[in-house]
Every structure is written in C-alpha cells, then in structure tokens.
Amino acid sequence: MNIDKYTVKASEAVQEASSLAQRDDHSQVESEHLLYVLLEQEDGIVPPLVEKIGVSPESLLDDLDKMLDRKPRVTGQSAQTYISPLLAKVFANAEGYADKLKDEYVSTEHLLLALSESKDETGELLRSRGINLKNLLSALKEIRGNNRVTSENPESTFRSLEKFCRDLTQLAKNEKIDPVIGRDEEIRRVMQVLSRRTKNNPVLIGEPGVGKTAIVEGLARRIVSGDVPDSLKGKRLLSLDLGALVAGAKFRGEFEERLKAVISEVQKSEGRVILFIDELHTLVGAGASEGSMDASNLLKPALARGELRAIGATTLNEYRKYIEKDAALERRFQQVYCPEPTVEDTIAILRGLQEKYEVHHGVRIRDEALIAAAVLSNRYITNRFLPDKAIDLVDEAASRLKMEIESQPVELDQVERKILQLNIEKVSIGKENDTASKERLLKLEEELAELSSKRNAMQAQWQNEKARINESRKYKEELEQLRIEETKYSREGNLNKAAELKYGKIPELEKKIAAVTAELEKKAGQQGQLLREEVCEEDIARIVSMWTGIPVAKMLASEMQKFLQLEKVLQARVVGQDEAVRVVSDAIRRNKAGLSDMNRPLGSFLCIGPTGVGKTELARTLADFLFNDEKALTRIDMSEYMEKHSVSRLIGAPPGYVGYDEGGQLTEAVRRRPYSVILFDEIEKAHQDVFNVFLQILDDGRLTDGQGRVVDFKNTIIIMTSNIGSEYILTAKDMGSIKEEINQILRDNFRPEFLNRIDEILTFNRLEKEHIRKIVDIQLRSVAERLQARRLGLKVSDKAKDFLADIGYDPMFGARPLKRAIQAELENKLAREVLEGKFPEGSTILVDKGENSLIFKKG
C-alpha cells in the first residue's frame, strides 16, 4: 500500500478509519470502519454514488453501527490497532481498479469498488443492497463522465456544474423566480446574440438596480415556457457561483482545475448549457497569483470558438474599469445596454410583483402605494436606480406593516401601561390608613376594574382581527401553491389535473379570499379598528422619510394646505420683510404645485440688504419649516473662498492632489443631506472663479465633484446673501427710488450669466422702530423658553419691552444691537438674581421698567 498514490480524500478516509477503530476499542481496522468513514465524508463522491444506485447512505450507516457494536473490544495501554488482512486486500484491489480505469491516483470510488467485491460482511451488506461492481461502474460513469483522476483532489472536478452553478431553468420551473415585466426588447436582443454561430456571448451592462439579472431570469422563464427560438429550446441556463469556485481552493492550481472542469462540462453538453456569469468583472484577476492564469484567460479560448455560450452582467463603471482594459475579453462579448426604466414602466413592474409581495408579507398593497413608490423614489431617492429602489420601498413598507400586525397595538399597550402604573400606586396607597387614602384606594380599584375590562375587550378584538388577517394570508399562500402546481401539470401535459385545479380548487379558494378581503375592507372603514392590513401611500412616504430625512407629511397632498400659510410662518420670525417673504413663499408654492422646472433647485434667491435685517434668519426659518429641523441648513461662509484655488474646497480636489479622497465641503454636505437649505453667506467676498461653480447648480440642479460623481441639487433651496448696496438702502426714503441703483451695483459686481440664473433678487429693507419692538417679543420668548428649563416663568411689561426696543434700536446694524441690549439689561442682571436664590423653582419673574434700567419682582 503506497499512501503517496492516494488522493487527499482517500488518505483522509484511511486515517479516519484507524481513528474510528481506536475510538471503539477495536484491535483491527476493518472494511466496516473504512466504509463508515467513506459514507460520512463531506464533499466526497461515495454518498452521491450510493444515492445514484437508489440506496440511502443513512440506512447503510445504521446497519454499519450495528455491525461495529458486535465487534470484540480490546482495552488497556498495550492495545494497538492493525489493518486486517481483508482490508489490506481491499487496498490492493483498489489500486488494481485505479489502473483499470487509467487513473493516476487511488481515490475513494476505487476503495468503494474494492469494498463491493470484498468477501467479508461489508461486501455482503453492499451486494445485498444492490451496490455491486456493475451498478457502481454505471453510476460512476454518470457522475464522473470521462474525467480521470489526475490530481490529489479530483472530487472538485466531478459534477462541477451541480456544485458551482445554480440552475435558473429549474428554479423557473418551480416558480422560484419573480415574474419579469417589460424588458422584452432586451430579452430579444440577448436571444439574438445567443443564436449567433461564434462569439455568441451577450453582456448586459447598465446601472446597478436596473434589472440586469432579472432579464436573465426572464430568459429562463421563457426557455421553460418554450417562448424562445428553436436554437434555445430545451436549453439549461446555469448561473456560475464564482464564490463557490474560489471557496476552499487551498492548493495552488485547485481553482483553475475547478474552473476547467466547469468549462469542460459545458463544452461536453454540446450547446445544451448556457452559462450566466453575474458580476462578470470579478472574473478578471480571480484566482491569479504569482504568474498563474486568472479566470478570464481560462474562459477566452472557449468563448472565442463558440464552444461555450455565456451571458455576462456588470455595471457600466466596472465594465469600463475591468473589461474594456482587456480588449481580448471585451471582443468576445457583445454589449446589450439595459437603460433605467421610466416611472410608468416601473409602475407596471411593481404591479407584476404585487401578488408575490402580498403573499410573502401577508398584507394587501394598494395600487396608490405602488404609484407612490415609483413617483416618490424617482423624485427623492436620487443616488439609486429604478425599479430597484421602488421595489425596496414597497418591500420595506409591507414588512413594517407586517411587524405592526404581529406586535401588540399601541392602544392596547397604552392601556396595559396605565394598569401597571395604577397597580404600583395601589400598592403604595395600601400601606396608608387615613381616610383620604382609603377613598383614593376605592377609586383606584374602580378605575383598575374598568381598565381591565377595556384591556380584555381590546385583546379579544386584536386576536380576532389578527386571526382574520392570518386566514387571508394562509389562503393566498395556498392559492400561489395551487397556481404553481397548475402550471407544472400544464407543462407536463397532465391536462386532467391542471383542469381540476384551474376550474375547481383555484376558483373556490379565490372566493374565500374575496370574502375575507371584503370583510376586512368593511371593518377597515369602522372606528376603533386596531390593525391595518393595507399598505397605502402614507406607508410608502414614511419609508422615504426614513431613508432621506425629508419629513413625510410634507410629501402628501393632505399636507399641502400648510404651504398656503407659509407667509405667516416666515413673518412670525422674519420681521419687516414682507416683500421678501412673499416672493420666497410664491417660489416654494410653485415648486410644490409642480409648476416649476423639476431640473433646477427648489428655489434660488439672492438676498441683499444691511446687516442684521433677517437675511440669515429667513434661511433658518425656511429650513425649520420645510424639513422640521434648523440643522438642515448648510451654511458656507464665502469669505473663506477669496483665493482662486479655493474652488477645490467646494467640490473636492482633482485626482493627484492632496485631499482627493475627502470630497468637497459643498458636494459632500449635499450628498449626505440632499434635502436642505444651502446658505452662501456674503458671496461678494468670494473669488470670481467660484461663481462658475454656481452656474451649473442654478441652471441644471447638479454639480460634478472632484471624483466625477454627479451631486443632485434639485431638492435644495439656495439662498445667497450680500451686503452690496447697504448704504443706499439705509439712506433711502423710498425703496422704489433706489431699485435702479441697486441693480447697477449688482451688474458691476456679478456677471450677467450668474444674475440671470437666480430665481429672485430679494431686497431687504432697513428695520424701523416698530419692527424692533416686534423682535423684542420674539427674543423674549426665547429667554422664557430657557427659563422654563429651570421651572421659572417670565412676564415682561410693555414699558419694559419699549425700553429694550429704545436702547436696542440702531438702523445701521439692524436687530443685532437688540440682542446685545437684552443680554446686558435683562439676562446679565436676571442671572445674578436667580443665582442669589431670589426666585425659587416654580415662581414667576415679573420684569418692569425702572428709572434707567429694568427691575425684577417675584410674581
């Protein structure tokens, strides 16, 4: 016995057989031990060989267990194990079978052949089960084909298509593939390329998520249904799993050996197998190390000769980066471009998938939800592609609703929390003996009894509603299964069975589903319903909100009424600038009504006026109103961009420069938060070249950063502020009279192409004394909110407010001196008195005017 001539699996089997004998205290390693370990080997050829003959490996193992239990045991330190003479003969015969089959190494199948001819109990067991030499050789030919054992690890080359590929046609037969809607043109083009004589290898290229893999799955469904040209009828479409090919390839050359075995099997199938290679770019460089060939070079000869038909799929970027660089590989594939479907096509795709998702999640999906998914994803999720992002929206919204159905309703949860709270209170009061406590205890018990009754009723209702929804889900799952069976019987030509299902069981089940659905719809309109089982437009909008940060309510038509009140909201914080507020409100309303250009930002405004009149406050208020968050304001101080080279800080450094990987301050802010108000403060201080960046943003709503990525500005509001012309505004008696001077100053300072792209130029008036008086109220409200945190109230008299307005009024500096006046006259003095303990928690501070200062009293 020359162990060097044994394959890895065969030598492992010999060692494991010896270990098994030692473990069981047997003095000899016999054929039973060897057969036992051969049947238990992972990825070995023996279990599939036995199964091919029609014998279960598990039943053989049970019989071997009984045989091993009957063997005599030898214990003690001197006990050693030896190979029995009969097993030695098995090894000799195995070497003989390896020579007969012209194999270079003794493999596990040769050991099994020798065991089947053995003259002991093991041989008798195998022969009694039909595992004889003739049957084994026949099964071996089917599994091994014409492959010979020429390496120490031959198992990786046997049945390689089954090991390293997924059979898409089989999955389509079993209805495990989602229906493919549309894409007929691309599928026809793929079939056209596949039917060529040579270089019949299409490669699907397109953006991620447009449905490249779905096109191949659609082809698999067509092959199964016979809706293909004669040259493709009856073909098998197999998806190559490159990860499985690489995984576990420990030794040098093992990966290449596996891939060659796959190519060889495809070639031997004589055109019956079409290979689908998803993520085609992963072939380039796969398996290459220290001069060995990579996977793409192994495939090239077979692809060029037309012996191997392959369909590739990869994204545009990866095709350019990997495939185009290898011209020899590129010319062997014919490009089939897959464009992103339109919103209308996406809605059709979603309608086709609707039933699959309804069955999976056990909820109903309304048509309005599908339309909302396509429209909202296209409008708001700009960094991904249709239909993938729309399908994900529907899937997640349905998943969220399913979770709500399966978990306890909020109303019931609130009642249970209240009961728990009252029970704690009851235990606490039960320890007291006074009359008031006893009365409170009686009231508590009454309230607890009432709440317990309410909880029981709600629990019963919840279980009832849940049971109805689960019943509907069960019926839908049954219906899908029956439809799969009907398709299968029709394909097999068993028309009696197909007709029985089509005209009997399926209509009967559809009636049951319709009855349950009608009942659920009837109850859905009633008050007090605890569970919903329909995904609607609002659910989709909520998921979009989670993904993007845009407030859900702002996207729904029911909330559009709020935009009619936009002026009031802005005027509450931006005082004395009614014209500017009106212009901004009109621009926002135009956009929300869908009347503005969707390829430009929501609005772009140049605000000019003196300092402290509300230009920046307008931006903050807009961010708060539109996005419910003042932090949605991205502020960029243009005084930092006074040099020519500072443009790269906005959009990111070009390749080869320091900071290339970091991205730009503006582009990164918008990529991370696409829905924001962008404030460019004091733009007149920026270098002229910086304005070239603005042209693209204002006109097309997009900007390309230093890394070549397109950043979308279509959902941003751009506000630029400038102090240009302040001297005219401060001295003017009438704003109309200085309009021409201001326009001239703007033309002198900014290029015409920049001014021409701005939606509106807003001139902010200087603030008068009555405006400052209104701002006093706003500022004092902020002080009162801060005091509330210390449980202190604040009441300020009108005289005190007038006093603050008088000392805080300076037309040259706007509202900022007022803030300083409030800080000096009110906050500083009040802080001292609060710290001295004059105003304990829960008290109210009354502020009035003294002679030349404010006075504070306890209210």
UniProtKB/Swiss-Prot annotation:
Residues 559-766 are annotated as: NBD2. Residues 83-146 are annotated as: Repeat 2. Residues 391-525 form a coiled coil. InterPro entries: AAA+_ATPase, ATPase_AAA_core, Chaperonin_ClpB, Clp_ATPase_C, Clp_N_dom_sf, Clp_R_dom, ClpA/B, ClpA/B_CS1. SMART domains: AAA (SM00382), ClpB_D2-small (SM01086). Residues 3-146 form the Clp R domain. One of its GO terms (cellular component) is cytoplasm. NCBIfam families: chaperone_ClpB. PANTHER family: ATP-DEPENDENT CLP PROTEASE (PTHR11638), HEAT SHOCK PROTEIN 104 (PTHR11638:SF18). Belongs to the ClpA/ClpB family. This is Chaperone protein ClpB.
